[in-house]
């Protein structure tokens, strides 16, 4: 059995919001060259888990480590090796596409020369829109602009929240190819989703989050589409009882 260097290590994570226990002892590992699809209904804690790993939220208890760095005590080191694409485009409507990337790279301490930024726009077929204000873009174009950051940052770990939501066909095809290449280079991918689409085609493992816990963690290759849906329904309904 192939083993992978652990790039994401989550152990016993608990997160309370008031009296509500959103995460209840979650443990999960994502290795080098692996993509894990974190599948669960709305409100199951998927986004909360990603925010903790991304250093945007502190756990109540438990630990999360990225590239060996603790997500609370070594947040800056974690962010240096991590790429995050949250749900929604998160771009600036009053800036052009090129200005959006220049602003983001400057904040991230990355090179911001025009040739490099234009090449990143070309990766997502937006180079002809470089000088156009983003307020005129479609939802899919805005999502592709957000994804262009992946061509600039070169992280070792990717966190994706509903990665294919809002993408047009060109964007979906580009992202799927980009993620396959990223895995082949030894990167680790953790994707949160409630759909049964392309995320599951890319995933090496499937983790079902229900009732604040990992109800199932299993290799994806052994499961057909009907198996995934059956297991998802069974575990989420059980957690709701």
Regions of interest found by a model, annotated:
Residues 158-161:
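Catalytic Walker B motif of ABC-type/P-loop ATPase nucleotide-binding domains
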Residues 62-70, 78:
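Conserved ABC transporter NBD signature motif
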Residues 54:
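Helix-to-loop junction immediately C-terminal to a conserved catalytic motif
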Residues 39-41:
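The feature captures the beta-strand-to-loop junction immediately N-terminal to the Walker
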């Amino acid at each position: 059995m192939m083993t992978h260097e652990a790039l994401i290590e989550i152990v016993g994570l608990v997160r309370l919001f008031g009296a509500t226990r959103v995460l209840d002892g979650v443990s999960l590992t994502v290795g080098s060259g692996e993509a894990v699809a974190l599948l669960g209904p709305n409100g199951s804690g998927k986004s909360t888990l990603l925010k903790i790993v991304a250093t945007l939220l502190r756990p109540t208890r438990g630990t999360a480590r990225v590239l060996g760095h603790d997500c609370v005590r070594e947040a800056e080191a974690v962010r240096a090796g991590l790429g995050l694409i949250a749900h929604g485009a998160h771009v600036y409507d009053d800036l052009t596409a090129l200005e959006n990337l220049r602003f983001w790279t400057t904040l991230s301490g990355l090179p911001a020369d025009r040739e490099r930024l234009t090449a990143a726009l070309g990766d997502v077929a937006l180079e002809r829109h470089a000088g156009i204000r983003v307020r005129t873009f479609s939802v899919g174009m805005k999502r592709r602009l957000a994804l262009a950051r992946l061509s600039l940052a070169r992280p070792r770990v990717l966190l994706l929240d509903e990665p294919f939501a809002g993408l047009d066909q060109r964007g979906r095809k580009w992202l799927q190819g980009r993620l396959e290449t990223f895995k082949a280079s030894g990167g680790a991918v953790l994707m949160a989703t409630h759909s049964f689409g392309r995320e599951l085609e890319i995933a090496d493992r499937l983790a079902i989050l229900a009732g604040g816990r990992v109800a199932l963690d299993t290799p994806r290759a052994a499961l057909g589409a009907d198996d995934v849906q059956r297991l998802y329904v069974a575990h989420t309904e059980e957690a709701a009882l």
